[in-house]
Amino acid sequence: MQVIKKVEELMGDAKWLVFQEEYNNKLNGKYETLFTLTNGYMGIRGTFEEGSEGERPGSFIAGIFNRGEAQVRELVNVQNWMRLKIYIEGEEIRLDRCELLEFQRILDMKKGVLFRKTVVKDDKGRVTKIEGYRFVSRSNRHRSAIRFFITPLNYEGVIGVENLIEGTVLNSATHPKYRVKHLKVVKNESICKSGIYLETATTDENKRIAVGSTLRIYNLEDINRENIAFFRRFIPLGENSAEYLEFKGEREKTVVVDKFAVTYTSRDVEKDLLKNAVENDLFDFVSRGFDEELEKHIAEYDKLWSVADITIEGDEEADIALRFNIFHLMSSVNEKDPWVSIGAKGLHGEGYKGHVFWDTEIFMLPFFIYVYPEAARTLLMYRYNMLDAARRNAALNGYKGAQYPWESADTGMEETPKWGFDYKGNPVRIWTGDLEHHITADVAFAVWEYFRATNDIDFMLNFGAEIILETARFWASRCEYVEELDRYEINNVIGPDEFHEHVNNNAYTNYFAKWNIKKGLEIIGELKENYPDYYYAITHKISLTPEEVEKWKEVEKKIYIPYDKDKKLIEQFEGYFEKKDYVIEKFDENNMPVWPEGVDVTKLGDTQLIKQADVVMLMLLMPEEFDEETKRINYEYYEKRTMHKSSLSPSMYAIMGLKVGDHRNAYQSFIRSAKVDLADNQGNAVEGIHAASCGGTWQVAVFGFGGLEIDREGVLNINPWLPEKWEKLSYKIFWKGSLLEVTVAKEEVSVKKLKGRETVKIKVKGKEMAL
């Protein structure tokens, strides 16, 4: 029997820890997001086990969507297995009803474990220490567990523990305008002779979600862990499943309560087999014990961190904040399931309804490409598996090829809501689903970025090429020919900056459309010359004719690129420079821009203020298209007009700031990005993690300060720059199958090959090296 580790014995070093030192129920929503535990299959928000005022409990399973009475399909808040209530002589103990003598919660990012340490005094003067930890297993993704250490400090008496699975959950429970119930309970039963089972079904497609749970209660000092509960009752409480147990509490004697939970859905097994699957897995989990699964879970995190961890010496704040972003990003992926992706808010909350945006391909995917290539391929396979839906989406909109939706769920069709609210709470039409077309090229771009970093020719031949060709076909049909100017234009769009709608010839969109078609033509040539069997197979499959290819060449050649090479200032879209100009001069306590005086936030489209990086984003993703002076001129112009109302923005300005020499602002933008959730500088951490910002923060560390980039010849270049107080930066990446470790100090840069048989050619500060 394994030794039980108490909180202090299990917890790691301080550099891996995120603390909550004070209880304030007004901050519950923020900490529930920060302390979410997820394994890519399911995510459990960091609510208190016993419940508290102002909480936003959430349990989410990747791929479980439903529309019901909502505007669009949304990620379902499924039954909450985590509730565990404590009673002293029949009186419930809750944080809001007791005097808190001690309080602390700690997220251990190294192990993927959430700890708690509380001492409470009830209204009868009884003092109880409640410590513990919980985890959502990375080893067996269906398993989760909670361990409580309960110690009566000044009394003896009967202590009750209520184990609950709550099926009364709602989506948007705190918002009457949007409140929806997506589930109905179909089974509420006892399980394993000493546990509870709740099975629910979604209201539209009858997708089943099954959760089983049981408790084990024993004295801490008992190495045999004999049950000490003298009473147990199973109670099916309508939509909630419960069991209630009692034991005798003795002064200063610690009792351990282990809660085991297992979750399966009809995506995993047939509906008729769900209860058997849950029961068998739960029985095995309990038989093997809490500690065995915890050890396996921690071992999986050790594997992930062995590549993913980045160390910053000399700046503890940046070091921990960066690690926090990496932790949540790498925890959010399920590399075994190519039918799900990572939503904009991860599995951490209901924000953006669990939908997948361009955030995944442009902001998150680079982390996985260089740190976890297997997961990167899986995320791109999600887009391939949704390719038929993208074809239908294009056809519905009157275009050819494949048009990826702005917001995607489990079907691959457009799921953007039609209505929302502006900054003053006024109802507004949401046009992004109709007009923000650049996502189609973003997906194709991500496919190519993955390929050039991995050389995964199998993926490119069987999946990636088809994505690039069908998206190129979309752009060739989306472009409009203007005869009097003899050029193709892309009108009535929204670029990355969403303050401006219905614009013509957005620079980012036009550049990416041109790139997409050009890359499609290159792939056709490569397939025809070097992979003729694949060439004939794919052109036959998608009915691509030589005549259509010639049309692509014409469109690609004549796409209007709005760039004045003399002025070197790129107009974000036609007419942008004619808008009313405001310059940002003030910043709030989080160093976020404050609206300039006189701005009407209901008419932002009439100004030059922009929501997020647009032209700057373009120059970062296509650096070879612009010289250094052009990058500097455009960075300086747009930086003063960017409100950073999207968490995606600061990281891009940080990297470009480093490229053009604005080091001070680059570091500030990096901290903005790294602490978007830790400091809640967007004010909406309650809705879920800013997953794209997590990816962007990693990009600043590696592509920015770490200086990693790929040149025109496809060679890896490292040209780093460290902030003054940073003594050393160290990171690891995979490059074409080899694992490299890069260490940047003030005076030197070292690169080691840790794995890989092939010789790797790189350039460090312009000097060629072979590893």
Curated annotation (Swiss-Prot):
InterPro entries: 6-hairpin_glycosidase_sf, 6hp_glycosidase-like_sf, Gal_mutarotase_sf_dom, Glyco_hydro_65_C, Glyco_hydro_65_M, Glyco_hydro_65_N, Glyco_hydro_65_N_sf, Malt_Pase/Glycosyl_Hdrlase
Catalytic reactions of this protein: kojibiose + phosphate = beta-D-glucose 1-phosphate + D-glucose
Binding site for substrate: 358-359, 611-612
Source organism, top-level taxon: Bacteria
GO molecular function: carbohydrate binding; hydrolase activity, hydrolyzing O-glycosyl compounds; kojibiose phosphorylase activity
Keywords: Carbohydrate metabolism, Glycosyltransferase, Transferase
Pfam families: Glyco_hydro_65C (PF03633), Glyco_hydro_65m (PF03632), Glyco_hydro_65N (PF03636)
Reported function: Catalyzes the reversible phosphorolysis of kojibiose into beta-D-glucose 1-phosphate (Glc1P) and D-glucose.
Protein name (Swiss-Prot/TrEMBL): Kojibiose phosphorylase
Gene source species: Caldanaerobacter subterraneus subsp. tengcongensis (strain DSM 15242 / JCM 11007 / NBRC 100824 / MB4)
Lineage, broadest ranks: Bacteria, Bacillati, Bacillota, Clostridia, Thermoanaerobacterales
